[in-house]
């Protein structure tokens, strides 16, 4: 019998399993935790084969997948998604988007009167991080609760966002429409619109309706009417009700001057401006002589009459969702000397889409 002076060697010789057991355990632990990383260079980055239900993998998979549904990979075939003139009969989904700095009950009631199937309509709102924005958000939440209590809240989905960008502190009409703040204001609005649309659009969305929070009266068939034109971008004509001081009678007047057709004067003005300057329509400080759709309204005309446009406002604009998916957004920077909704129209046209307006189809803006 061989006897070593070192008592540890003698112990190992008598009981070899005392050493082999911990070494084996360490090897198993090493391969369990580190083998995937050690040999990753010889494997594909992603492996979609179902993992073994062996002892080593069972617990790890359970931890990772316990909160996921069984079929946690969703497949969408957008080639089958339609945006047609027969939207309602084809059950096409509509996303109504509204940047909101103040809440008007008339806006909310008008939305709820729309006759398009509410189960096919999703709503999206974005609020500025201001005191007015806080107040508007609370009022909308109260309106939602009231409508729900009355069992009239049947929309597919409602998303409410808060801006992570700046906004004007004052939302009074005279302040937000002042010429000197237009570039800053509309740049902020563009950021808000982009956040809203790209946070809420779904694979099932066929149409996006941009509806300003100040639009308080539309035909109840607004969605059917606009989608019925089957255009990539189509804008209603925004007017405003008021009391005519001359006749002392209720009257209407043009309101949104951002729906326009480009002019030679407008092109010359753009060519004379520095790259970072924008043209703002509807102000005496910048005369463009563009044809404004607001002035083309004919009370006796056909509401379905169309005209091609080069710029649009944001009052009531129906957009095929694929226009946004293809990259048309609201530039927060001068884009061919245009910004926000007018810049969006330019971008859509640069992508190959046509933009239309309906001069005899009226929606009405709130009168402050």
UniProtKB/Swiss-Prot annotation:
Signal peptide: none annotated. It is found in: Golgi apparatus membrane. It holds the Pfam family Anp1. InterPro entries: Mannan_Polymerase_Subunit (IPR052086), Nucleotide-diphossugar_trans (IPR029044). It is a single-pass type II membrane protein. It comes from the Eukaryota. Gene3D superfamilies: Spore Coat Polysaccharide Biosynthesis Protein SpsA, Chain A. GO terms for cellular component: cis-Golgi network; mannan polymerase complex; mannan polymerase II complex. GO terms for biological process: cell wall mannoprotein biosynthetic process; cellular response to heat; filamentous growth; filamentous growth of a population of unicellular organisms in response to biotic stimulus; filamentous growth of a population of unicellular organisms in response to heat; fungal-type cell wall organization; protein N-linked glycosylation; protein N-linked glycosylation via asparagine. It comes from Candida albicans (strain SC5314 / ATCC MYA-2876). Keywords: Golgi apparatus, Membrane, Signal-anchor, Transmembrane, Transmembrane helix. Required for the addition of the long alpha 1,6-mannose backbone of N-linked glycans on cell wall and periplasmic proteins. This is Mannan polymerase complex subunit MNN9. Belongs to the ANP1/MMN9/VAN1 family. Pathway: Protein modification; protein glycosylation. Residues 1-15 are cytoplasmic.
